């Protein structure tokens, strides 16, 4: 796995346990070639810096998604290994399930359960598909992501910081239940460790917490920030990073804050939701999103608290402080700075 220059974490499991984990999940390359039609383009679900993901069908009828590391990739080997060792030890209904692994003939492949509705961003930000997400489904997605993060941060045998939580890394099953995926950048915390530091900041602009972008500091509260951004996106149907890829002058956090202070935040609720739902619940979710995206990591709620806030409207919420706002990228495409949203 990639070395961190500081705060190196002691692994909570031994290399011998790692080997046993890998060996127990091995599958042969011939089975995967047959399942994916020889990794046919027609079965390709998507592609990233690590390589491609293919849909496949095993002989027993199970549908799978095969993540294949590109042979030309240099940085992906460590991330693939990291993902394998992490996900194999994590079991939760709101995390994507690792089925097996193949390490034959210079191939490096991770085999996951197939999640039919693809990623959240492909539905939420598609003008035709977003109508499939009524308020009940959106609330279920928000709550499911929260429970998955609570498990990673507090309830699993490992304490895991995802570091790349975003709409494209949340998959939706047949019933639109969310499953957090892509653990290539995730990090383990051992013992009493509460944060890590890295000189190589990786992630997606618009979802990364300010302390991570500016100083390389990451913790469970970095994931809480990313979750808050996603909550605001799910309620409004707007991308936070639109202002970095278009001529929009302000990001979603600033927009929500301006409407919050003006008492008009309900105007930002996705209009495709219509009127047959509780706008109060939607506004409460936006309130939670603002609490999660405040600049001070210590002020952001733990995910267990977020789950409680979502589970009962009798849990009182404190007034949200000004969220962190990303200044718009300049015309040359260079990195922009972060600031605090103004009222």
Task: Give the residues covered by each predicted segment.
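Conserved eukaryotic protein kinase-like
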Residues: 1-343
């Amino acid at each position: 796995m990639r070395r961190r220059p500081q705060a190196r974490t002691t692994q909570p499991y031994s290399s011998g346990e790692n080997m046993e984990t890998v060996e127990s999940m091995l599958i042969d390359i011939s089975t995967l070639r047959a399942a994916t039609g020889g990794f046919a383009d027609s079965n390709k679900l998507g592609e990233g810096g690590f390589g491609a993901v293919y849909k496949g069908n095993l002989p027993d009828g199970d549908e799978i998604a095969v993540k294949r590391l590109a042979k030309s990739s240099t940085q992906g080997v460590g991330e693939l290994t990291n993902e394998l060792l992490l996900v194999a030890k994590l079991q939760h209904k709101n995390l994507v399930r690792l089925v097996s692994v193949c390490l034959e003939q210079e191939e490096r492949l991770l085999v996951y359960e197939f999640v039919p509705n693809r990623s959240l961003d492909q539905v939420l930000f598609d003008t035709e598909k977003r109508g499939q997400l009524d308020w009940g489904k959106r609330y279920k997605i928000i709550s499911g992501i929260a429970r998955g993060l609570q498990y990673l941060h507090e309830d699993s045998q490992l304490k895991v910081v995802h570091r790349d939580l975003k709409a494209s890394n949340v998959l939706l099953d047949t019933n639109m239940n969310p499953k957090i995926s892509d653990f290539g950048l995730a990090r383990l915390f051992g013992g009493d460790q509460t944060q890590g530091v890295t000189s190589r900041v990786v992630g997606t602009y618009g979802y990364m917490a300010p302390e991570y972008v500016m100083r390389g500091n990451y913790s469970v509260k970095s994931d809480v920030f990313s979750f808050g951004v996603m909550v605001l996106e799910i309620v409004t149907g707007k991308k936070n990073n639109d202002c970095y890829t278009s001529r929009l002058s302000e990001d979603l956090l600033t927009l929500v804050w301006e409407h919050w202070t003006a008492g008009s935040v309900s105007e930002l609720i996705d209009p495709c939701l219509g009127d047959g739902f509780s706008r109060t619940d939607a506004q409460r979710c936006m309130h939670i999103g603002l609490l999660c995206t405040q600049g001070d990591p210590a002020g952001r709620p733990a995910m267990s608290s977020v789950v409680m806030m979502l589970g009962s409207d009798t849990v009182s919420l404190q007034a949200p402080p000004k969220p962190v706002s990303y200044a718009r990228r300049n015309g040359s495409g260079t990195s922009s700075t972060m600031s605090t949203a103004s009222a």
